[in-house]
Amino acid sequence: MFDAVIDVIVLGGGPAGLTAATYLRRFHRSCLVIDAGDSRARWIPESNNCPGFPNGVSGVELLRRMRQQATEFGTQFESQLVDRVALSDGVFTLSSGSRSWRAHRVILATGISDRLPDAPWVEEAVACHALRLCSICDAYEASDSRIGVYGPLADIAAHGLFLRSYSEQVFLVPSDDAEGGSALLEAKAAGVRVLEYGGTLGFDGSRCSYTLGDGRVELFDSIYPFLGADTSAGIVAGLGAALSEKGELLVDRHQMTTVPGLYAIGDIVSGLNQISVAVGQAALAATHLHNALPFAPRISRGAKDT
């Protein structure tokens, strides 16, 4: 596909990476997207806060449209899981097994992977909105319903308080027996209820449940799990890229990491994990990157280049 060093490799084919690719190709920069096919967006059954979709859009459909748009402008794709990123003499080399690609710049857009309850029904519950993964994205749809918030008590108290502005019936479902601290006191004062630790999560095909030790069952229209997330930012830690305490890549106002020429966008950086934010970060990174690359005067070819 590319025998020489190309301008940019975008690692990750979610909303952030696909937006960056579209921008880069419209800047007439050679661009390859390497994607493992596991974008977090694919879990979204329907998004109603994504601009331009008044009737909502599924994550799968949004990804399809964004990939189609990037392809229309000549973006090339590889379906691979990159396991190594190296830098030598100003050129990045990305490797997957015995295969490798080289580029002058890299945009890391690999996102994060949510830690979900260890249960066989998780995908089905997400698909029917019984298990929701983003309170900022879809708490509006859960308004005035019974909402559970599942995870370590110290972590979920603040989330429960946030959700209290959407419903009168918010329950903290602890995955541990730790103390909740001041955040828990604030949540309780706002009317958030706390269930006993040690129960069992369940799903009946349409609603999630929590069975307590004494046999009582609490049913929820939706449960939000907050169990943390895993990131692949470590793949560039060997290059000297600085990470936050949470393992997120630290970037400047242009989305460049502490490694010159290496950019990061989307959920892999610190900030609000929203598609709209990721798209904006992609525009910033792609534009700065384009202007930082050597000037390439246009030679008319009479047709679109590829």
What is the role of each PLM region?
Residues A21, A157-G160, S167, I265-D305:
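A conserved FAD-binding loop/helix module that cradles the flavin
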Residues S30, A36-D38, P45-E72, C134, ...:
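N-terminal glycine-rich dinucleotide-binding loop that anchors FAD/FMN and/or NAD(P) in oxidoreductases
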Residues A70-D89, T93-S95, W101-A103, S167-E248, ...:
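A Rossmann-like FAD-binding core segment of flavoenzymes
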Residues G12, A109-G111, L116, Y150, ...:
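Short, well-ordered coil/turn residues at beta-beta hairpins
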Residues I6-E61, S145, P152-A178:
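Beta1-alpha1 glycine-rich phosphate/pyrophosphate-binding loop at the start
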Residues E124-E141, L227-L272, S276, L284, ...:
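FAD-site-proximal beta/loop scaffold in flavoenzymes
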Residues M1-I6, F77-S145, S222, A237, ...:
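FAD-binding core/adjacent interface of flavoenzyme oxidoreductases
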Residues M1-D7, R64, S300:
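Extreme N-terminal leader/targeting segments of oxidoreductases
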